[in-house]
Amino acid sequence: MCIRDRLAMALYGGSVTSRLFLNVRERDHLCYYCASSFQSFTGSMAVNSGVEHADAARAEAAILKELDDLRTGPITDEELEDCRLSLLSGMAGIEDSLGGIETWYYMEVLRGSGLQTPDEARAALRAVTKEDVRAILRQLSLSVSYLLTREEGIADV
């Protein structure tokens, strides 16, 4: 996963300032939790949410609408910077320990896209634009959607 992907995921559903958290969860009250994640080794993105069965269709529609809105609508400077600062904050302590450095470079090797130092990654993150984010999100399409629910007649434990 490149740094642009990480910012796109943070904006869509990977942080408490994301569209999924602020709109689908907080504003619309359609789920208990709602978050996106990017699987860097498969190139797939997932959205996980906890919803009431009766709200499942509305929640799915709202989740997909937020993705479409990010692809085509306005992205405010404030929301982009909030997500960028959140990621930069998470990267701040990488070089504070040998384990942090080791983990950073281990993941860089596994990704196979060339080694990038933490400083280079932070600089790249600072350079990501709204259009970069839109371009990443435009590449996504719905592949599968499923709803896990309990069987009728099974008592809550």
Residue ranges and their predicted role:
Residues 1-5:
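Conserved small/polar residues in nucleotide/adenosyl-binding loops
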Residues 6-8, 24, 63, 87, ...:
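Buried hydrophobic packing residues in well-ordered domains
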Residues 14-29, 41:
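M16/MPP (pitrilysin/insulinase) zinc-metallopeptidase core fold and M16-derived inactive scaffolds
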Residues 15, 35-94:
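M16/insulysin-pitrilysin zinc metalloprotease superfamily fold
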Residues 27-31, 42-46, 142-143:
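Active-site lining segments that contact anionic ligands and/or coordinate catalytic metals
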Residues 27-34, 129-132:
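Short amphipathic beta-strand starts and helix->beta connectors
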Residues 83-157:
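C-terminal regions of mature proteins
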